Each structure stands twice: as structure tokens, then as C-alpha cells.
Amino acid sequence: MNRRRFLQLSASATGLLALRPLVAAENAAPPTGKGASFFLASDTHYLANKEQPDAMDETSRGINTRLIEWLNKLPGTEVPAEAGGGMVGEVSGVIHSGDLIDTGDKNGAAHVAMQKTEWAAFTADWGLNGGDGKLRFPVREVWGNHDGPQGKGLVIDGLRERNSRRKEVSVSENGMHFSWDWNGVHFVNVGLVVGASKDVVRPRRYAALESLDFLTKDLAERVGDSGRPVVITHHVDVARYCAPLDPELVSKNEWDYADVAAYHAVLTKYRVAAILYGHTHVRKIFPWDGATPKLAKDAPPGKGISVFNTDNSGHFNSETQALMYFTVTEKEVFAREFATPDAWLTAAWTPQVWRFPIA
């Protein structure tokens, strides 16, 4: 059984939706007034043809082409009542939570050639600032473990160059992390994982590239005590990496629990509307108080930061894909899911709404 199938079965068995979704009858109408609306996509895994590395895999190419088409045409369309109703408004942009391509974690001449093809296809589709690719909106992406887990390589170099051209953002000194504002909401993209805590000196499996330092400084300088809502995006999930482990085992984890704890400690000083990530290829939505999330099917909603672990949006090895549509206001986060059972040939709104106040 592969990781993807294991996670799908686990999610189904546990019902990991500790933040209870609303239905239309429970005050699920979209919020009105000032706010930031945007799409969230993840795990597109652009894949080149292994036998012909300078060409894209046809399945990957088709899925991601159709994904971009859906993103472009959703604004202005109606949302059914069972998914909250209303219209999809014009969005400020699209956030992509990583694994842009598939082979950035692999070595060898053939894989390097594949990376070039995959990266060229991704940038041609997604563009950068809106209208300079097939996507008509700005994209704000982070990198995932399939893009460059050790913080080096073609995609990492490409992202650093893209960040230098990205409009209306504040970029970290190393060029890899950035923040921006959309309609009164502050957004921070912090890469693969958040770290590394200087209080714990030991090897890490993945390179954080000083994302914790950037996040700490950015929030202090650009949000401070203003009370503005904050949205954080990274790639790896917090759910599995909150609990302490034997020091001899922790370096095998994708995210060191000490870094997860340090990350949460920084966030407690601010009004965090949402944490966004992908990686698991399964949608999970829950409140996070810094501890391992409760997995019981009937777990109470509880208190904590609203975490949105979105499904894959363009993976070549799956018919089922999804993206999310958010509106974040001064007081609440309002989220819906748009999903496909057949690799974006058709798609529909999931009959649920997630609406949570910002503490």
C-alpha cells in the first residue's frame, strides 16, 4: 500500500474533520464586506516523460492544463446552495502550497533533464504576476519536498529568481521566503517547513532555509500589534510532527518537532486566520493548539488555529483532485472546496462549508 492510499484510508477511518463543516442551513452564506478572496492549489507534480525527458508526460500535461482552465473560469460562476451559495468573486490570486514538479528530489542526468521540462511547463502555465502565463491571476507558491528537499537545485534557483520579480512582496534576505498583503490580510509563504529553531542543534531531514527567522521578523515588523489577520503557507503538514520523539529517530521525520513547537510559539502572538498546506494528498481540516490533533471521529471542535490541509490539485497518478476557495475577513475565514472525480474533465463544489472565527 503506497503512502497516498494509506493516508486516504486513514482519513476516511478517523473522520479527521475536527473543525465541523457547515451546511447551507447553518448560516453558510458567504461573508460580505472587505476581505481577501483567493484559491489554494497544491501538489501539481508536473511530470516529464521518462523515455523522452524533453517532453511532458501526457497525463500530467492534460490534468494541469485543465486545472488552469478551471481556475481561470470559476470567478463569476454560481456556487450551489449546499456549498454556501453566492457567486465566486474575482480573486486576488492563487496560493500554491508546493510540490510544483515531481522530480526535483531526484538525481542523475535523466532526472535533471526531466526537471528542466517540468519547471518550464509549470512556469508557462502558472506565470508569475498574472497574465504572463496561462493563469490569469498572480500565483504565490512555496516549494515542496519534490521540488528541492535540501534547499538547492533547479526549482530552488528558479524560485529565488521568480521572487526577485514578484510584485508587491517583501522577500527574505536569502530570496526564498516572502510576504504580502491582500485587502487587509497579511500572507506569509515560508517554504517546505518552518525552522530551524536555534535552541536545538541536530540534523534536519529537510532544509528550512531560515524560514522561522523570516517569519518571526516579518510578523513583528509588518503585523505587530495591529491585530490584522494572518495566513501562513508551507508544504509539509503539522499534524504528524507535533509530538516529541527519541533524538535518534527525530532526524528521520520530515519536520523536527522542536521546530514545529517554535513555529507555533511564534504564531500565538498574532491573529492567525489559517495555516495552509498540502503534501498528504488528502483534505484534512482541524484546529491546532500546538499539540497533536485529535483523531477521534467525534472530537469536539476545540480551540486553536484553523488548519487547512488541501488535497492534491494536479497529480498525474490520481483521478481525484481538488482546490479550495477562501475568503478571509477581519473576523472570520470562510472556505469551500471544488473537486473532480475524473482529472478535471468535470468538477463540482463539495457540499460543505468551513467557517471559523479568527481569535
Which residues are covered by each model-predicted region?
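N-terminal export signals
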Residues: 5-25
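Short, flexible/disordered intra-domain loops and linkers
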Residues: 50-60, 106-117, 199-204, 243-255
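Active-site neighborhood of phospho(di)ester-bond hydrolases with catalytic His/Asp-centered motifs
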Residues: 40-42, 94-98, 140-144, 232-234, ...
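N-terminal secretory signal peptides
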Residues: 1-2
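Short, solvent-exposed loop/turn elements at domain surfaces
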Residues: 38, 46-52, 196-198, 241, ...
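N-terminal active-site segment of His-dependent metallophosphoesterases
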Residues: 24-112
